[in-house]
Amino acid sequence: MAEEMRQELSALAAIFCGPHEWEMLSCSETDGAVFRIHTTAEGLAGEDVPLELAFHLPAGYPSCLPGISVNSERLTRAQCVTVKEKLLGEARRLLSEPMVHELVLWTQQNLRHILSQTETESSNGTCTLPESSTVDGGLWMTLLRLDHMRARTKYVKVVEKWASELRLTGRLMFMGKMILILLQGDRSNIKEYLILQKTSKVDVDSSGKKCKEKMISVLSETKVQTEHKRFLAFEVKEYSTLEELQKEFETAGLQELFSECVLGLVK
């Protein structure tokens, strides 16, 4: 991890030092840092709106954009997505310099305006495309591996909900003990999915207590190529044999992905 990122994390921990303001979730040399900041901003009626801002600073940060997730019990999912898109736009302006504190301040200062703008567009029946739709040059794809699902029914519903809200398509695939998630969509939305996956209590531990997903692996992340099939929906599928799973990948034009990332998991 770069010294610049270490210094920024240290400064953020000192700035957001109030009760429950700062929460470091993971930090490593290879994957960077994932953390949450709990703050408030002024809403439409002048009220304090609680905000949960989750950030993933990848190893290449600040030369590349952070992953950002926005959640609030007072905002709709659509409003949270809009705030995230605006934040990513601001992040692009600040690229190559430490930016997290600036982004938090910007959110606090601009939330009311963003919500007002969203409300106006909604009442006028207009629909604007997300700013991030062309940031990374089209559709991206990532393949994830989960170690286990103890609370499978609940876990599956949460994954389906996230995929729907973030406009991601693909597959949640079960074969024996193997669990894979293949996602296609806008890269910033895939990044937000990963933040949600790592920061939300989606499963239970051996004692039945709710817990966060700590055993998730990113097997591949790449742009969708012309030979790859575009998934039209997100589906949950179960396979009895390795051949069935392989056929799913081959049908989608992902033979190479299967050979490089999946085959070795069952040997």
Curated annotation (Swiss-Prot):
Keyword Magnesium (UniProt): no
One Pfam family linked to the record: RWD
Ranges where the record places region Interaction with UBE2I/UBC9: 13-15, 100-102
SUPFAM superfamilies, alphabetized: UBC-like
Main location: nucleus
RWD domain residues: 7-114
Subunit structure: Interacts with UBE2I/UBC9, NFKBIA, HIF1A and NCOA2.
Protein's GO biological process: negative regulation of NF-kappaB transcription factor activity; positive regulation of hypoxia-inducible factor-1alpha signaling pathway; positive regulation of protein sumoylation
Source organism phylogeny: Eukaryota, Metazoa, Chordata, Craniata, Vertebrata
Gene: Rwdd3
CDD domains, A to Z: RWD_RWDD3, RWDD3_C
Source organism per UniProt: Rattus norvegicus
Domain notes per entry: The RWD domain is required for the sumoylation enhancement activity.
Subcellular location: Nucleus; Cytoplasm
Protein name (Swiss-Prot/TrEMBL): RWD domain-containing protein 3
Any one of the GO CC terms: nucleus
Keywords associated with the record: Cytoplasm, Nucleus
Biological role stated in the UniProt entry: Enhancer of SUMO conjugation. Via its interaction with UBE2I/UBC9, increases SUMO conjugation to proteins by promoting the binding of E1 and E2 enzymes, thioester linkage between SUMO and UBE2I/UBC9 and transfer of SUMO to specific target proteins which include HIF1A, PIAS, NFKBIA, NR3C1 and TOP1. Positively regulates the NF-kappa-B signaling pathway by enhancing the sumoylation of NF-kappa-B inhibitor alpha (NFKBIA), promoting its stabilization which consequently leads to an increased inhibition of NF-kappa-B transcriptional activity.
